[in-house]
Structure formats: C-alpha cells, structure tokens
Amino acid sequence: MLYFIVNEKSKSGNAKQIWKEIEEVLKVRNVSYQAFVSEYRGHAGKLAAEICAMDDNDICLVAVGGDGTANEVINGITDFEKVRFGVIPTGSANDLARGLLLSKDPKNGAIHILNAMKKSREDTWCMDLGEVNFGEEKRLFAISAGIGLDALVCKKALKSTIKDILNKIRLGKLTYLVLTVQSLFTMQTADAEIFFDREEGLQKKRMIFTAAMNFKAEGGGVPMAPAASACDGKLSFCEAAGIPKWRTFLCLPFLVAAKHTSIHGFSVTDAKDCTIRLSRPMVVHADGEYCGEVTEVHFHCLPGKLRVLK
C-alpha cells in the first residue's frame, strides 16, 4: 500500500499547493493511497510509527516535505524490513533529494515513485543510514549529522526569519550560507579527542566542526565530503580544527567548490564508527534537526538499512 506523510508548512507553506499537484497525478492514474498531514514538530515520526503498525508487509512510505520531514519519517519507522521509503522534496535545502538525484518537479517525482513501486522489494535500491548517539539518546540520519558550526547553523535556521524571507524569494538555499558567516565569528570552539573505528584517539585543538556525511553535501548543497557514498558502508567525516576563524572564513568559497580537502586545518576521513570527546559542550544535529549540546558523541553507519523508491 502507498502512504504519504505531508508537511504542508514546508517551504513557507508552498508545499500545500505542491501536494495538490501530486494528488492530481495520483487521481489521473487511479492510484490507491492514504495521506496523512503532519501538524506539528515530531508528528511525522509518530505518523510513520502508526503506519508501520498496520497489517501491511509491503509499505511504500513517502515523505512530502523538506529534509527535516524526511528525517522524522525515517526515525519513526519501526520495521525497516517491510518499508520502502520515498521522498518528494518541498523544502528549502532538499539535500536528501539532491543526493538521491531525484527530480525537482513534484509531478515527475510522484511518477518516478509509482514506477519504482513496480520493482520487487529485493530489487529495490538500498542505502546506508547513520546513527548518532548523544547522552542517553540516539537519532538516525540520512544526509549528515555533526557537531560545532554546522550544527549551530541548523539550530539557528529553525527559528530564523532569514530563512522565511529567502524562501519567499526562492533563495532558501542561501539561508545556511548567511547563517554560517553570521555564526562563525561568535561561536566557541572546543578541543577534541577523536576515535575512528575504535583506533587510538587523535587530538584536535580548537575544533570548529565535524560533519558525519552519508551523502556528499548538506546545508543546501555544500559538498562537505565530495567523495562520500551512501552505499559503501561508511560515513565520511569532514573536520575543521586548529586554524583561526578568519582563515576558515576565507576558505568558505573553497568549501562550496569542493576544493577544501587539501587545505591545512581541513580533513576528510572515511570510517564506520567515530567517537568524539570534547573539552566543552557543542551543539549536535542530525539532518539539520537540533539535538542539544553534548561533550561526547558517537556516530556509526548502518549499511543498507533503508530501501529507497528511486
């Protein structure tokens, strides 16, 4: 059975009209489906859990919304064996859809999902997921998770008027760039000890950020880990540490152009697991969703966890 979880408020409310266009495609093709509207933060995850509890062994579950909605839905899935997941992007960043090379046109996206449903479960493409553990809590992520600057930007974006303004003039992707510049010079860094795949710890002074990447890009298309793959059983960890903030600022154009990996102070490491211990609390995020502030965090990869309709 085909189920939709729709966030009509994404992209400053434009998603409501987009959902109407998707429904037209479904009606023309006489497709049987059920749709549920996410009404508040966290609701999409609850809806996903309720759908998973239904007596249905082949659930095709589609998130209509931004990256945050998709993350909620994925975290709400209670049985990955009977779920095939799809996404029709209506957000401002849409990094998951970009990483999956999905159509930007919602009607084409719906048609593509309907065609993908014709494949058997065994032939459906599988992607890795990441899991971040912080304190007594944990959260799955499809795109990225991280601590420091990128997480601080995600926290600010949740309540930013800049994001709403830029979305209205169709420049929502710039939100993260504007907030990055704004946050860089005011944030506090932390010294860190990093353990990749449980090996000996690496000492990092004045860490600005560490991003655990499943796909190449986050934050509206910034290629933090240009060689990352969502089906290699590993995460790519992009770090910036031990360099002045002003130099980090000057390196931002290289970061956007995916030319940062050879610059002093930046590094990218592929690993299945990573534990980071910090000298002071730093903000942590998962797929742009604020998760709090921590002094220790653990990331690990869940290979082939999610079947994707693509």
Model-predicted regions and their roles:
Residues M1-L61, N71, N75, I111-H112:
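ATP/NTP phosphate-donor binding region
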Residues G146, D150, F209-A225:
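Glycine-rich phosphate/pyrophosphate-binding beta-alpha loops
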Residues K16-I18, V73-I77, R98-L100, K155, ...:
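Short amphipathic alpha-helical segments
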Residues A15, F196-K204, P223-K310:
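ATP/nucleoside-binding phosphotransfer catalytic cores, i.e., glycine-rich phosphate-binding loops
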Residues E8, V64-G66, I88-T90:
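Glycine-rich beta-strand-to-loop/alpha-helix junction loops that act as flexible
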Residues R29, D79-R84, T90-I208:
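Catalytic core of DAGKc-family lipid kinases
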Residues A44, G68-V73, D95-L96, M127:
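Short glycine/serine/threonine-rich phosphate/pyrophosphate-binding segments
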